[in-house]
Amino acid sequence: MSDYFTFPKQENGGISKQPATPGSTRSSSRNLELPKNYRSFGGSSDELASMYSADSQYLMDMIPDSLTLKNEPASGNTQMNGPDGKENKDIKLDEYILPKTDPRSPYYINMPIPKKLPKSEGKARAKQKVNRADPSDLDVENIYETSGEFVREYPTDILIDRFHKWKKILKSLIAYFREAAYSQEQIARINYQMKNAVKFAFLTDLEDETNKLVDPSISKLPTKKPQPVPLAAQKLDSKYDTDVEQPQSIQSVPSEEVASASSGFMKFGSGSIQDIQVILKKYHLSLGSQQYKISKEILAYIIPKLTDLRKDLTTKMKEIKELNGDFKTNIGEHIKITSRLLNKYIASVKLLDEASTSGDKQGEKLKPKHDPYLLKLQLDLQLKRQLLEENYLREAFLNLQSAALQLEKIVYSKIQSALQRYSALIDSEARLMIKNLCHELQQGILSRPPAVEWDNFVSHHPTCLMNLKSTDPPPQPRRLSDIVYPNMKSPLAKCIRVGYLLKKTESSKSFTKGYFVLTTNYLHEFKSSDFFLDSKSPRSKNKPVVEQSDISRVNKDGTNAGSHPSSKGTQDPKLTKRRKGLSSSNLYPISSLSLNDCSLKDSTDSTFVLQGYASYHSPEDTCTKESSTTSDLACPTKTLASNKGKHQRTPSALSMVSVPKFLKSSSVPKEQKKAKEEANINKKSICEKRVEWTFKIFSASLEPTPEESKNFKKWVQDIKALTSFNSTQERSNFIEEKILKSRNHNNGKSSQRSKNSTYITPVDSFVNLSEKVTPSSSVTTLNTRKRANRPRYIDIPKSANMNAGAMNSVYRSKVNTPAIDENGNLAIVGETKNSAPQNGMSYTIRTPCKSPYSPYTGEGMLYNRSADNLMASSSRKASAPGEVPQIAVSNHGDEAIIPASAYSDSSHKSSRASSVASIHNQRVDFYPSPLMNLPGVSPSCLALDGNANGYFGIPLNCNSEARRGSDLSPFEMESPLFEENRTQNCSGSRKSSACHIPHQCGPRKEGNDSRLIYGNEKGASQSRLTLKEPLTSKGVEAPYSSLKKTYSAENVPLTSTVSNDKSLHSRKEGSTNTVPATSASSK
């Protein structure tokens, strides 16, 4: 658009000072001049003449100063302000011009009108900016460099400044991306260096060239190349191959993969430490590669695109500057001309209206050029020219703004695309970092327990380490009772009596202290009671002779006096802690007296005399010394002429019993020679002679204590019983009966004590039964003639219907009974070492130790009960129908109760409990209590000895009135002692056998049996059961009566089956010595 509006010069040559505006004074209209090219826009000379003629002044004088309304009236409101801002009710809207803010007004413009700077100011500012510009940049960019001045409010200038700022943003982004690419490249080099720093010499590694998994522990041996084969040989081989039938290819079965690597750790990929080298190297290698990729992507894609965009933006800024001329407009001058013509038109119309109303004919005469029609025509043509200029300016604005909008959208989208690409690269780097390091560690070594490597290491070295995992409990140390070997419960290997005695031989004049052990076949004399000390120990040296009258004498025979333990053979626990090892020299007795050729010559309360053949195991000088004193017994090969009878036996036969057999058959002559030499030495070191030994009570004081006297009586009675038999088999049967009667008696005492007492006393020997049972009491003896030839092992078939309780008892019976305990004390038949306090306020019960054949593997359980609980629970019933406690025998001699839930046969439950339930006349309720699990309360029909499937494994006392026919379990119906052992007492309410454990019942009301009286004694904590007259059993033959009648009344103990308190507790001596809570299972 050209600047066609110019201000014409006045006659005096000056330019009009101020153009006329609508609403100006009348004199201002005279100074208005139109541009020279007004005709080119449709203007005529008549319009100019009419517009600027001097005779048109009368029209202009008729109109007011301004015809434009100040305020636009509201719709439906006739009140408005006039041109002077005063309210006038008589103003008509059609007589005034609308304001320029109204789109209907001829003065309204709907776009901004650009303002030009003065020529001198614009040139000076442009020159100043060009001088400060960088010669390397474009002129258009340098002009709009940021400075302290504001940008001119012009459309092109504003947009150029806008895109100049975008160029600066692109320049900063390009600089940042260059630095980011450089930093990624540097970090990639660092990651490669860190990858090379990961060095574990023996873990699985990544090969640098191929990135394959390799095991550094496996040495790489070079593969041998095949030798070249000549062509003739190849043809010959191919000919043979065609003739021979090709066998089928055999596919080798792949060996099972080893779970452990060659380094000793778990295999790679199992989440072990073996993965750490591959994980770290893989992480740094992948991260370095990704960072190199990011650097190349930034330099090759992001930065070039931003650089090209910046260049294109510079070109577009030049194009915008070229549009600067499109915004040069004279719309303001057109508005002024329109205002002049509009005022003339309004004045002519007003003049004619006023003349017609007043009737003045002079006023109606207007000049022809001031005809309202002609003035309106000129006004419409001017308005048309004004609208054309206005539309042209609008098109310029639309063109510029739409182009700028598209350009900025392109710039913004390019920046978005570059940032999105960069963000995707960084995101891939972060995901790679999380995947290759974090996830690998979290799913691998971080998710494993700390001991997984140790468990794998231990399991792969079974030859040098125990297969003990971290979650496994530590293995229990094996005890001697856990060892199983043939004949481990043979009665021939039992210790009958042990302790210190004073001995006097025929050649000596004084008594000598010695440690004696009475077994099934021999009476051995040892140096000391400590079998765990070496021969160089101070305790193995000779000690002074101990006589009953003088303890400070020196031992003349050279035997070891030892310490002064109790008469039962127990040692001081402080001394047992210093034992270091087992010395073979301490296990050989000084002398041994065979019971097969021995007889009890005399016995009193304080002494007894034995005659027989003695074997000496001392060195040769001892044998020579003894032979010099008794010339008639010097040669062991002579036949003894005296004492002919059952004791007559050649010394050679006696000597062979005690000679240990160390020889082994071998085909090598040297070994045979060596064995013969050893046999000759052993024969020379053993001497035999007929002796007569006198024994006395050993006591630390001048007078023996009652306990020592009592123990000495037991020695006398046991020796009497053992020397009365002619063969080892008879003596073995006697020991078996002794063990059985002792256990039944102890269990009965335990049951009685748990009912009527709250204290525990030491164990009473089974020999005392013969002393304490009165003739009037009911006794039951065993017939040894019927049982002399009984089988020592009864095979019980394991049928399918055998109940679980019987099977458990069979398995629990396979528990070894050691001959010596952990403290070095010898185990004595019929007695247990009781460690419970004497007051009986608390007791300890342990479950059986785990044995190779026992299904029960639980740890030891401890039950502590006070006296109050015992008293409170003693009034309850021992058992109820269906509740059968089980007994397990441990190596400590204790009993633990297996719950009755182990039984699967309900008939077996009821049958086992019937022996207890038959005592009561009415049904009682059962209250579970821990007291019911105590020893002595369980039925006697359970296995009481540890011999599996043997004689002592047969359930005893399997007889009851309520158990007949199908009520008996298959296990008990197969027992050969079921019918043989049944006897009936006077009351008729229960049946009893020789091996029956007396069951005690709680207090109840008096029933039909008039002999039973229930009452509460004064001061007693619980009710007790008393009898008016004793219960007896008649027609029972005494055991071993046919073997030796002279000793039957004194030697054989009798087992009582009386179930009252009087018969069990009213004893002549040692009434406080009751049976402990634990059974004698350790014998």
From Swiss-Prot:
GO terms, biological process: actin cytoskeleton organization; positive regulation of glycerol transport
Residue ranges of the region described as Disordered: 1-46, 69-89, 534-582, 979-1083
Residues that span the membrane, as ranges: none
Matching SMART domains: PH (SM00233)
Cell cycle found in the keyword field: yes
Biased composition regions of type Polar residues, renumbered to the chain: 13-31, 549-570, 983-992, 1043-1061, 1071-1083
The protein's name in its UniProt record: Regulator of the glycerol channel 1
Upper classification of the organism: Eukaryota, Fungi, Dikarya, Ascomycota, Saccharomycotina
